[in-house]
């Protein structure tokens, strides 16, 4: 249903007043604090109509209203005025990264801190799966008997260690030859491509060093990442939720429980983040577990390739006009840094 300009102006003012003050909003407040150009009586009439349409609801008998999920949805989609980050805020973000070592995990830790601190909400950053990163170098090292340590150095700066066990002894010289052969042929490809296509093709050609076809299947299997691992999930700002939901104990308990379900968060941030742009999930339009919560998400890239995602999690009365540009600016900065790390 299309809203008239006056309905849109009143809904916009009501959402912003409620975000600012966290109290039900009445016609008198809107008339006095916002330049809507309407009398209190007309505003009261419009508020009643907005309530009938499901955009706002009366929380108490006092007459004040608060936005519904539908009201927030319309506000975010078409009414919000985005504020540009101040120069000081941009400097603060950049300074946080300068304090970190330029490794992927350190960049993602800094990202979670920045988002939580400046949004005054919780933050989640999902690092790349090993299969989405590209290989820079592989090293096979003999440990003991049939045990081999495989070290995968990825373009992003991530270093993965995998133990491989064989039923027979393998010399370090053989492992050196296989390492060199793999580096010559699979460097620059992602792990999934190496596992599913390149190593099988190399085995069929039978051109590798002695023993390669015998060892290759185990090497390919060991390259795989555990899809249930949550080691690449970075969370910060949970303390902000205590302030955000201090008057809503049941809601606070539900959202803190959500952060205990790290596998759910990982899957959610893998599935709900768009290929481009910033996406806002309001309440149960994302999942039944998210009632009363807003999640703002986006992805970050290495070059042109999307390798991970990030998000801000907080109450629906979030300061959208600051949170949306914050996550957009941060994702672009992170993408630039990770792309440089990969070169």
UniProtKB/Swiss-Prot annotation:
Source organism of this protein record: Leptospira biflexa serovar Patoc (strain Patoc 1 / Ames)
InterPro entries found in the cross-reference section: GAF-like_dom_sf (IPR029016), HrcA (IPR002571), HrcA_C (IPR021153), WH-like_DNA-bd_sf (IPR036388), WH_DNA-bd_sf (IPR036390), WHTH_transcript_rep_HrcA_IDD (IPR023120)
Family: Belongs to the HrcA family.
A single MF term (Gene Ontology): DNA binding
Domain of life per record: Bacteria
Name of the protein in its database record: Heat-inducible transcription repressor HrcA
Gene, per the UniProt record: hrcA
UniProt xrefs under NCBIfam families: hrcA
UniProt keyword Repressor, yes or no: yes
Coiled coil: none
SUPFAM superfamilies according to UniProt: GAF domain-like, Winged helix' DNA-binding domain
Job of this protein: Negative regulator of class I heat shock genes (grpE-dnaK-dnaJ and groELS operons). Prevents heat-shock induction of these operons.
GO-annotated biological processes: negative regulation of DNA-templated transcription
Keywords: Repressor, Stress response, Transcription, Transcription regulation
């Amino acid at each position: 249903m299309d809203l008239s300009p006056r309905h849109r102006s009143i809904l916009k003012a009501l959402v912003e007043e409620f975000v600012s003050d966290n109290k039900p909003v009445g016609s008198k407040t809107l008339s006095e604090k916002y330049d809507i150009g309407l009398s209190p009586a007309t505003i009261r009439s419009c508020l009643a109509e907005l309530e009938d349409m499901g955009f706002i609801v009366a929380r108490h008998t006092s007459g004040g209203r608060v936005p519904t999920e539908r009201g927030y949805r319309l506000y975010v989609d078409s009414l919000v005025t985005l504020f540009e980050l101040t120069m000081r805020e941009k400097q603060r973000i950049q300074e946080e990264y300068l304090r970190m070592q330029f490794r992927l995990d350190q960049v993602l830790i800094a990202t979670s801190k920045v988002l939580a601190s400046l949004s005054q909400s919780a933050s989640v950053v999902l690092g790349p799966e090993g299969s989405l990163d590209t290989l820079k170098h592989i090293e096979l090292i003999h440990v003991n008997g049939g045990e081999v340590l495989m070290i995968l150095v990825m373009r992003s700066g991530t270093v993965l260690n995998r133990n491989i066990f064989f039923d027979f002894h393998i010399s370090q010289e053989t492992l050196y030859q296989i390492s060199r052969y793999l580096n010559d042929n699979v460097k620059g490809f992602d792990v999934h491509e190496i596992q599913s296509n390149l190593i099988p093709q190399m085995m069929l050609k039978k051109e590798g060093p002695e023993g390669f076809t015998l060892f290759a299947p185990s090497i390919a299997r060991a390259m795989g990442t555990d899809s249930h691992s949550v080691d690449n999930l970075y969370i910060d700002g949970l303390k902000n939720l205590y302030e955000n939901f201090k008057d809503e104990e049941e809601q606070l308990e539900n959202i803190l429980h959500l952060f205990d379900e790290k596998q759910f968060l990982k899957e959610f941030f893998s599935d709900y983040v768009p290929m481009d742009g910033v996406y806002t999930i309001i309440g149960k339009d994302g999942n039944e577990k998210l009632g009363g919560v807003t999640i703002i998400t986006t992805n970050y890239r290495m070059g042109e390739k999307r390798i991970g995602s990030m998000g801000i999690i907080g109450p629906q009365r979030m300061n959208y006009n600051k949170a949306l540009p914050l996550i957009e600016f941060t994702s672009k900065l992170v993408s630039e840094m990770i792309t440089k790390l990969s070169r």
